[in-house]
Amino acid sequence: MAVEALHCGLNPRGIDHSAHADGIKLQIEGEGVESQSIKNRTFQKVPDQKGTPKRLQGEAETAKSATVKLSKPVALWTQQDVCKWLKKHCPNQYQLYSESFKQHDITGRALLRLTDKKLERMGIAQENQRQHILQQVLQLKVREEVRNLQLLTQASVECSP
C-alpha cells in the first residue's frame, strides 16, 4: 500500500499543502475518523479576497469548518486519553475499571505493556474481561504499527531523489 500522507512546501504567500488520506486515521474536531469517509478527496489552498491563504478546503463538506491533524502516538497518551480509549473500546468494562486504570497510572505507554497478570493484579478478576481488554490493546498496537510504517514510508518517499 503506497501512502502519501501530507506534503508541505513554503512559498512567499503561505504554505502549499497536498494531502492524500489513504488508510490514515485523522482527528477532526476531536473525533477520530477513518480515512474511508474522506478517501480520494483533494485538499487545496483557497486564498481569501486579499490573496492570502484563508484555509484548506476540500470536496468534503466536513473540511469546511474542521481542522485536520494526525492523532498523537499511543506512547504519548495521558491517563485521560487512556480512559477515553477504554470508554470507547471497552464500554462494558469502563465503569468497573476506569478507576483502577487511574489508580495504577495507566498511560499510553503502560497500556501498550499490559498483560493478563497485570490486569489481574489491577483487580480485573474475570478472565474473559481481561482477554477482551487485551484483544483491544492488541488491535491498538496493530493500528499504531501501521501508523508508524506509514510515517516511515512517507519519510523515505520524501527523502528519495
UniProtKB/Swiss-Prot annotation:
InterPro entries: Aveugle-like_SAM_dom, SAM, SAM/pointed_sf, SAM_domain-containing_protein
Gene3D superfamilies from the UniProt entry: Transcription Factor, Ets-1
Region Disordered, annotated ranges: 44-64
UniProt-listed CDD domains: SAM_aveugle-like (cd09510)
SAM domain ranges (all copies): 77-143
Classification via PANTHER family: STERILE ALPHA MOTIF DOMAIN CONTAINING PROTEIN 10 (PTHR20843), STERILE ALPHA MOTIF DOMAIN-CONTAINING PROTEIN 12 (PTHR20843:SF2)
Record-given protein name: Sterile alpha motif domain-containing protein 12
UniProt organism field: Mus musculus
